[in-house]
């Protein structure tokens, strides 16, 4: 037995979003034991948590969520009463090349966790009382929205963090009630896992919650994703491979704001409910690239526009969804959450972090990463 008030597993806790959730909860809840369960694939990095690794309420467990028997043992050994499930393969390009890995991790891994939690919690005298299975998903399961105004219209959403660039590229937004229509192997695998989570509530009464978030950005993101990749490329004077014309639109959410939302929903969200988590920030990809160029050049002391010549338009991604835009007013209305940072402020923090932590970047971009990068972009 232990003296901790709660014992919570965060799967994928060494990854990008997961490490921010682990850090927040370890520091905020010293009476909780936070178990970071991670397989440590290419995107998992324990260096992301160097500042909490010696905390008494932090535990790292090296395990694969698809290993059902191991998961069963971990749940019992640590008397787990909460699971925050972030472990997933998440890069669309990788899913196009290798959909089987995405199905294994995102679908079968989620099912393994659900079944292990079901069996363990049902074996306890109190059953599901005080338990919670929180599954983090993506807005990509909803499909794509049309761009109905290429120049942007004034957004109907207003928060204290609304930026000067506060506009939308259409009047439609993803709601929690939007029908699923995934277009990539990645989003199809996440949609399937979402359905399994809801089915375990409907069938067995498991206390589950699902959230769907927009694009995250911030420190510790593996540089296969646009923002850290381009920051690093600008710094090293490498090409900036922009898919197609760069007109695709995404909503952006600062990762620490997402971690705050996860903490809030885990504790106060309604069982069996769904919450969208968005940043109220729609940007065209090409405009993001220009903001990154301007910010990195300024912080490196380069004349404005120095790196604009690095922009290289490459063959578009297969099945590239045109626009994602998320309506998270339900979360704002019911639980009082909203983003804390204007996008421009978040980008400034993010760029500064990557420039100040070049050793971290060098470590994660060595070896196999370079082969992946060449394979992805060299012949496009």
Briefly describe each language-model feature range.
Residues 2-8, 24, 34, 63, ...:
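C-terminal substrate-binding subdomain of Rossmann-fold SDR/epimerase-dehydratase oxidoreductases
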């Amino acid at each position: 037995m232990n003296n901790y008030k709660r014992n919570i597993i965060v799967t994928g806790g060494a990854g990008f979003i997961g490490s921010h959730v682990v850090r927040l909860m370890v520091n905020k809840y010293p009476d909780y034991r936070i178990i970071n369960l991670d397989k440590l694939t290419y995107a998992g990095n324990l260096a992301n948590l160097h500042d909490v690794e010696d905390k008494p309420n932090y535990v790292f467990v090296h395990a694969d969520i698809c290993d059902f028997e191991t998961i069963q043992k971990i749940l019992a050994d640590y008397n787990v009463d909460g699971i925050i499930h972030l472990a997933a393969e998440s890069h669309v390009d990788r899913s196009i090349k290798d959909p089987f890995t995405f199905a294994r991790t995102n679908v079968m891994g989620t099912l393994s966790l659900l079944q292990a939690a079901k069996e363990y919690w049902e074996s306890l005298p109190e059953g599901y009382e005080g338990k919670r299975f929180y599954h983090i998903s993506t807005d990509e399961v909803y499909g794509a929205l049309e761009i109905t105004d290429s120049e942007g219209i004034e957004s109907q959403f207003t928060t204290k963090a609304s930026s000067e660039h506060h506009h939308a590229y259409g009047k439609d937004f993803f709601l929690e009630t939007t029908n699923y229509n995934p277009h990539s192997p990645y989003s199809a695998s996440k949609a399937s896992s979402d359905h399994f989570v809801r089915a375990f509530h409907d069938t067995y009464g498991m206390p589950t919650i699902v959230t769907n978030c927009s694009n995250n950005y911030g420190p510790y993101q593996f540089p296969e994703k646009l923002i850290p990749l381009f920051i690093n490329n600008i710094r090293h004077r490498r090409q900036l491979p922009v898919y197609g014309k760069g007109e695709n639109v995404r909503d952006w959410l600062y990762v620490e704001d997402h971690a705050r939302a996860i903490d809030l929903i885990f504790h106060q969200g309604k069982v069996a409910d769904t919450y969208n988590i968005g940043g109220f920030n729609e940007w065209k990809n090409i405009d993001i690239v220009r903001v990154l160029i301007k910010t990195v050049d300024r912080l490196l002391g380069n004349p404005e526009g120095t790196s604009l010549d690095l922009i290289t338009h490459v063959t578009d991604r297969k099945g590239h969804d045109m626009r994602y835009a998320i309506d998270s007013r339900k979360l704002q209305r019911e639980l009082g959450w909203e983003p804390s940072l204007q996008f421009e402020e978040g980008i400034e923090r993010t760029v500064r972090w990557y420039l100040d932590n070049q050793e971290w970047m060098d470590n994660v971009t060595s070896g196999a990463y370079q082969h992946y990068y060449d394979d992805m972009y060299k012949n496009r």
